[in-house]
Amino acid sequence: EYARLAINASGCTPLTQEQWEDPSNGFNSAMSNNAWIWGLALPSESVANLFCFTAHMSTENAWSAYGNDACRCINSNLYNSIDLRDFRRHSWLDPDRKDPEKESYDYKSCRKEGKEYFNELPDYANIKFRPAQGAYEDFKVGGAADHPYMRVEEMYFIEAEAKAHENLGEGIRLLNEFMNNYRIVGGGYDCTNMSSSVENFTNELMLQKRIEFWGEGIVMFDMKRLDMSTRRGYVGTNSPASYRLNTEGRAPYWNFVISRGETQNNPVIATQNNPDPSQTVKPWNG
């Protein structure tokens, strides 16, 4: 009920493909779209080089090795689950983009040598978060990027999940409607066959929600709420060896722990702290 009220009262509409892939304003400008309900506006005078979201999450920026050298990548398993007709797939670099024998998407870039630059980056690198105004060389301008806290798309997912618990068919209809109206180019998405139960439907909805809000800090809370497992270790994984962590149910490291330095100075905190999750999940080694 309240998700639908938020959709109607906000007057917001989901991002279009053009807005999503905009090389100058993609996920960095509240004024360039009608999807953001709530966000953070960061003026240039508040930007301190590396101390901003863009420096770490924008692969196209030229001033921060955290972004353009470390390169935040999507899990290959998650990427491979994205429908080929889904334009959100263009948020990450396809492993086949350099193969002349295979058809590849013409990725948009704020860099003059965009295609050549993208070919140098690791497979699955994200290009979702662009430097503000496309200013990839100037951290004062490019780093002054707005950041979304809440997009109207989240309300559509909340509504579909809630409705499915009352009427599974209605939840399926709502997810199909969202995907075909706003994400799948040409339509044709149908989750009916993979939604024989509320649990199966929720798994599919969460898959689409993970794709939708990748890097925005939204889905971890859903996965904790639903006690969902993580899978980073598998044949063909692109996760670094020490990060190939598989869990049964919610990950213990999703609970924030106050650091040792603080507990040493304030012993009372140690009695009220969350358990230290260090080494509770061993990396998968094949």
Give names to the regions the model predicted.
Residues E1-T54, Y79-G286:
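Acidic/polar-rich alpha-helix caps and helix-coil junctions
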